[in-house]
Design a protein with these regions (language model features):
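Short alpha-helical transmembrane segments in multi-pass integral membrane proteins
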Residues: 35-90, 97-102, 188-218, 286-312, ...
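Membrane-proximal transmembrane or re-entrant/amphipathic helices at the cytosolic face
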Residues: 338-399
């Protein structure tokens, strides 16, 4: 159907369900772990159980996406049958050709995704072994539980939203490549990257500025000092992970299926070496894992950018893609922080956080348009962009 909107929507729903189930399961199992602590005279069971509960959200999110797609398929099935009846006079491709095409397309994507996500396994193994060797075994369960069960939860949602918006443009990119329309191809690449950054950059700033309110809101009654530090220091992961994912999709959209595999493999080797040095010699602990993961995604961004430039002679536009969102996000962050501080003494954390987030969204939306970071046509091409464009006109921000 030449649309990625269902995929975009499913990614957002997947991360929302992941977040909700992870929070509920982590809390329930953490409380169960506290009872085990009392029985066995330890402090580690609660953190280990909490981390296990956080992992349950991943499966629940994936199951939700699957159910959503099955429902969409059943909804579109009558329309698909009508199209098949209309095209009965045309020659149909054989099952062998279809299977071969799917195999050659899907396998590189699966391998690339596996390499992309295997960094977490390497992090877990190296962190556990090296920290144990350094005599820091007591910190392993608690720090890793906070990192994997809470920090990842916070930054995965904006990454999913950014990537879902940008991935909705990939079919148009593939069409332009198939039609050998160089101008449209370059425009689609630029749009995909720009839309990703329009969401990712303010999300990173928002996480850094509101790290404490958000952490205390989602995980009340806990000592969130380490989580707040991780969120502040690691908020840039939203930007580099969003950019690395969308550039992977761009390379796949221009029929360079093997390139993301090579780039992810090189980045994974560099990531492993850097992580080992940070843990073993710099004694950075869980923050070594944090920074090594940011560098891993950054290496993929750099290698992917070089590959796109080489294959399509593409030159990345900087002002509208990076600088304008950064300026708008800086003002947005200051506004959100100021509003939260002013509202907290009156309303408390829950309402103050909600107000500051709404103010941040409004300020960023207005500034992005006033600074010409996005025009009416670009806004309409985004999922839900028609309504946003209408709102901008009502506010006299656009013509």
């Amino acid at each position: 159907h030449s649309t990625m909107v269902p995929t975009a929507v499913s990614q957002i729903f997947e991360q929302i369900v992941n977040a909700v189930i992870s929070l509920l399961a982590a809390k329930s199992l953490f409380d169960l772990g506290m009872k085990s602590n009392l029985v066995y005279g330890s402090t580690e069971y609660s953190y280990a159980f909490g981390a296990a509960g956080g992992a349950l959200g991943t499966g629940a999110g994936a199951l939700t996406a699957l159910i959503l797609f099955v429902g969409l398929y059943l909804m579109y099935r009558p329309k698909m049958k009508r199209r098949i009846r209309k095209e009965q006079g045309t020659s149909a491709e054989g099952y062998g050709m279809i299977t071969s095409t799917l195999f050659l397309t899907v396998v590189p994507i699966i391998v690339s995704s596996s390499l992309y996500n295997s960094s977490t396994v390497i992090d877990n193994v190296l962190f556990g072994q090296i920290m144990t060797g350094l005599g820091e075994a007591k910190q392993i369960a608690s720090q890793w539980g906070i990192y994997s069960g809470k920090y990842h939860l916070l930054f995965n949602i904006p990454v999913a939203v950014a990537n879902s918006l940008s991935s909705s443009l990939i079919p148009a990119l593939s069409r332009a490549v198939a039609e050998k329309d160089r101008k449209q191809t370059l425009n689609r690449i630029a749009s995909a990257i720009r839309f990703s950054m329009i969401i990712a950059i303010p999300s990173a700033v928002g996480l850094a500025v509101l790290a404490a309110p958000i952490s205390n809101l989602l995980f009340p009654g806990r000592d969130n000092t380490d989580l707040i530090k991780m969120t502040c220091y690691g908020s840039s992961a939203v930007v580099v992970y969003s950019l690395s994912t969308v550039t992977n999709a761009v390379l796949q959209g221009i029929n360079r299926m093997k390139t993301p595999i090579r780039n992810a493999g090189i980045s994974l080797v560099l990531h492993t070496v850097i992580l080992f040095v940070m843990l073993r010699y710099l004694h950075m602990g869980i923050y070594g894992v944090l920074y090594a993961n940011i560098l891993f995604a950054l290496f993929i961004c750099i290698l992917n950018a070089r590959s796109i430039a080489r294959f399509k002679r593409y030159r990345q536009e900087v002002k509208k893609t990076f600088l304008t969102p950064m300026v708008a996000s800086a003002v947005m962050g200051a506004a959100a922080f100021g509003v939260y501080r002013a509202a907290y003494s009156v309303f408390g954390n829950l309402i103050s956080t909600g107000i500051s987030v709404l103010v941040a969204v409004a300020v960023y939306f207005v500034l992005l348009i006033l600074l010409k970071g996005v025009d009416a046509q670009e806004l309409r091409s985004m999922p839900g962009g028609t309504r946003l464009s209408g709102l901008a006109r009502k506010l006299h921000l656009m013509r």
